[in-house]
Structures are given as C-alpha cells and as structure tokens.
Design a protein with these regions (language model features):
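Gly/Pro/Ser/Thr-rich low-complexity, intrinsically disordered segments predominantly at protein N-termini
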Residues: 1-200
C-alpha cells in the first residue's frame, strides 16, 4: 500500500483497494463517515481534505441557490457533497453541488438511488477551499466533462475567479465575484449569484 500526496489530495494506492466492488467501496464510505472518500477511474482511493467552516458556508450557499431554483422549476434533483456518483469510467465523484435531470433520475432503480448511482449529473459545481490545489480540481472538472457533464462551474473564492466548463470548448475564465453566472441552457433560468461567496 502506498500514499501519494498530489496538490494536497492524498491518493491511496493498493491492489486490494483497487479490487473493491462498487458495493464494497460504498460500504467503506459508510464505515468512515468522518472521511470524504472518492475513487479514481483506476479504483485508487482519494482522500479529500476536510473543508473549514467558511469553505463549507460557501459550498452551502451554492447548493442553496441551486436548490431554490430547482424547487421552483421542479426539473430534476439537487445534491450536495455527501452524495457520490459512479461515473461511466468507473470513478466515484462527489461534487460540492450537482443537479440531475428528472429523466435521468427516473432511469435509476430505487436500490441504485440508495447508494452511489451509476449516472453522471448534468451540472456540477466545485468550490475551491484554501486547502485545495487548483490543478487537481481542474483535472476533476475535465473528468466530469469526459463522463457526460453538460455544464460545470469551478469556483475559486479566494481569488474571485470562476471557470466555466462546457463540452467541446476550452474553459472560460471569469474574474470578479460581483456578478452572476448563467447556467443556460442546461438549467433554464438559473443564475448563480457569486456575491455571497466573496471574502468576509
């Protein structure tokens, strides 16, 4: 068993862990609720550093705005960072906020919904905390796109920079959190207000 520290993300490499089934990995996560675990496509386990209270507040703000929009529109379902999704490449990822269309949700069985469902959200958001390296987050966003995400926001509140990811084009970089990010056409009518994410 070996450990690799990549931009403050700890990767646990072990042949035994790489052989875990989807069900066994889910059970591992349930047995360790105080640790946020993800799984790479090669089945190596990723330990995510815990976020501080301010980072958690900002992630909660994003999730809250998305939840309020979805409550009004009722076009799908909203998830926060404790939810994991088993992507087509076999990785299991947990965005800070995610939205799944109603059509995609209805294709899942009840048993799948209770675990890490084999589905890729249409929209994801990652919020960078001071302990997060930017490079692994950008790689994570590329993984989302490669697996079917239609729109992704990578938010860096410390530098007031947002990166918008869409399939087939380079990420768009936006500076300044005195604005809203438009999620059309994936999320009709949703605009993420960045001002509550500013420092202080």
């Amino acid at each position: 068993m070996t450990f690799a520290d990549l931009d403050n993300v700890v990767l646990l490499q072990s042949p035994a862990l790489a052989r875990l089934t989807d069900e066994e990995f889910f059970d591992l996560c349930q047995l360790n609720p105080t640790v946020r675990l993800e799984r790479a496509a090669d089945h190596n386990i990723i330990f995510m550093p815990p976020a501080g209270s301010e980072s958690s507040r900002k992630s909660g703000e994003v999730h809250g705005q998305l939840w309020l929009w979805n409550r009004e529109r009722r076009l799908g379902h909203v998830y926060e960072s404790s939810a994991g999704f088993t992507l087509p490449d076999g990785s299991v990822r947990s965005p800070d906020a995610a939205w799944l269309s109603q059509a995609a949700f209805e294709e899942l069985t009840e048993a799948q919904r209770q675990r890490f469902p084999p589905v890729c959200p249409a929209f994801v958001v990652e919020v960078r905390s001071p302990s997060d390296g930017l490079a692994p987050l950008r790689r994570k966003m590329e993984t989302y796109l490669a697996n079917g995400v239609q729109l992704g926001f990578l938010l860096d509140p410390g530098n007031e920079t947002a990166y918008i990811y869409r399939p087939g084009v380079n990420p768009e970089e936006i500076t300044g959190f005195d604005r809203e990010l438009d999620a059309e056409p994936v999320l009709p009518g949703f605009r993420l207000d960045l001002r509550p994410l500013r420092q202080g």
